[in-house]
């Protein structure tokens, strides 16, 4: 059952917002996220370009001029990637995430795409339940390895060699 909050929520194309506004709402939805993933406007613009995010078909949830959430749609070769779903923490569990997801699925269908995929952080049980409810299913586990940034070149190894005849 979708709540009255979700019913009163408008889904607006993300293209109607600036990159700065999108970065702001995205970051607000992630303040308590399992894995910190903040993005400034420049980094979000790079993400949009790298992952072929279609802002015209991506969505922002809006109610009474208040941004409540965001969801983005990446499009490549007949496939849709539903990504960057986020809902403000104090408005979660009211159907906004579901409304955004259903909106993205509808946007993909408008593009004649019927293969939708997504990723979810392993311990994000609420999102995982939502995705299963919407007909998605697990196909595997993606392992992401990260190393700390490397700021200086490694020390040069100096070796001495001597010819032995």
Describe each region flagged by the PLM.
Residues 74-83, 92:
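A conserved beta-turn-beta hairpin within the catalytic core of GNAT-like acetyltransferases
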